[in-house]
Amino acid sequence: MKVTFRLVCLVFAFAFTLSAVFAQDQPTIIKDRVQLTAYTVNNQKGNYDIWTWLPSLDFRVNGPLESGAQLYVEVGYPGAPKWVTFDCSTGVIQKGSWWKTSCGGRDIGEEKGSTYTGPITFTIKMRNELAGTDSTIFTGKAKVMKAKSNEYGPKVVNHHVYWIDHDWNLPIGYVYLMPNDVYGWKLTNLNVAFWIRGDDFKMQPHVFYQGKEIGKVVFEGREIGTPGCSPDIENSTTHYVEETIPQKARWNRMVCTFYNVYGNDESGQGDGLFGPKFLMNKNPGDYEFKILWNNKLARTIKFTVKPGGNFDNGIAASSKLGNDRVIVPVTILGDQDGVWDKNAWKDAFYGNPLVGFTAAP
């Protein structure tokens, strides 16, 4: 009897261990890289007087992705819960790596285009015919909107351009370090990311430590290593909308790199010609990022670095973001973004809101 009891316990423990290991090795979505957009189709089943739309999805998955794995997406709306289903390019990767894929849009088939606008749902799933499995790895919701195109004439009254509302992104920023091209993680630079609604013209980033601007290096009368910003995600319509639409229904995530502000330096190269580096791990305290957009102050972001250089606030981990970027609230100033929904962040990441995050006033 005792032998039987011990055997049952061992089998249960073994099964529990296998289950735990299996769960830890499942692929996960990098949430801030999920980007759902609307692809406008310039006909409705051959009728070019009416435009429709199809969903397009770009996302990244943390490995592992095993042999035989196939990522796919289901999209639906009220009355058509499984409107379209489409496969996404899928490779084989190990744990610790990620896979980027884009799918949907015209590849779904233009004949499946819809004129529906309003709330939609979508699910990222993974099946494996070899293993006989089919699982859900992300569920989301979004809002589809439309406006007339910028065309003129009696035949274009139903030429609508479609897009997904991404206002929820605007109050959410990211602070993180990136490795040097030569020294890797032994020498890191400060990066700050944030969203704008509109075009990314004339961006001038600045960062302050305890109220004093840092990262400015001047050599022979000229600034060197000037920080710069560029978009790493661009969400825009596939066709031009009418001029009355705020910022042309365009959202960009800007990434600003500070080449003279370092997270750490273990490269052993010394200070060099331009003097001591500014090292965040040697300068704990309060930092503030400011961006001038078209010569006007448009964003501020505050964060605190602890002794040793850590500035993580735990929001990304608690929210299962899928990467180690630090999430911070963004103060939005001025009117360059136009009219936007200031409560949209509560449904951030397509209905997967952040844990412990409060938007800046």
Each predicted region: which residue ranges?
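Low-complexity, Pro/Ser/Thr- and charge-rich linker/hinge segments at domain boundaries
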Residues: 143-163, 308-327
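A detector of low-complexity, intrinsically disordered, Ser/Thr/Gly/Pro/Ala-rich segments
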Residues: 2, 15, 35-38
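Contiguous segments within soluble domain cores/interaction surfaces
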Residues: 24-135, 164-290, 299-301, 307, ...
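Alpha-helix boundary/interfacial micro-motifs
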Residues: 19, 23, 302, 311-313
